[in-house]
Amino acid sequence: MSEAKVGIFVDYESPLARRVAGDVWSGLSRAALEAGFTKTTAHWESLREVRTPTEGPSVHVFAIGQDRPDAIDAVGAVGDPGAPHLYGVIVAVPGKPSPLAGSLLYQGVERLTGTGVKAGMVEPALLHAVPAECERYARRLLERLGSS
């Protein structure tokens, strides 16, 4: 294995999403190094701006904060929805999540599958801004990447 490339789309207007995205990236970079990748790069973009398809990333992560639920409307396939990309959909939640957080997560998955992304290529998660929790999710993404 040589390089792991990740596209990270963050709702920068949400403090929750920013913190969780940073913790997930830290976890991804550590897990990739342990998995034998010699280089790990991330292309960070604002979720609320026009998306620029980038060549290479096999994983695209969307980080939305429970505090800014309208950002879910910006979730969508990157490039060809039929391409073998793995998608991470994260709803960042505070210590006590809203009962609607699960519905928000479901909407994010539906926005991807509605554009043609296979449901099996989406890894959804409700995450707190807790490094250990985010790292477990990051490791799961890398495991899924290795098996896809």
Task: Give, region by region, the residue ranges found by the protein language model.
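Intrinsically disordered, low-complexity regulatory regions enriched in serine/threonine/proline
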Residues: S2-G27, K39-S148
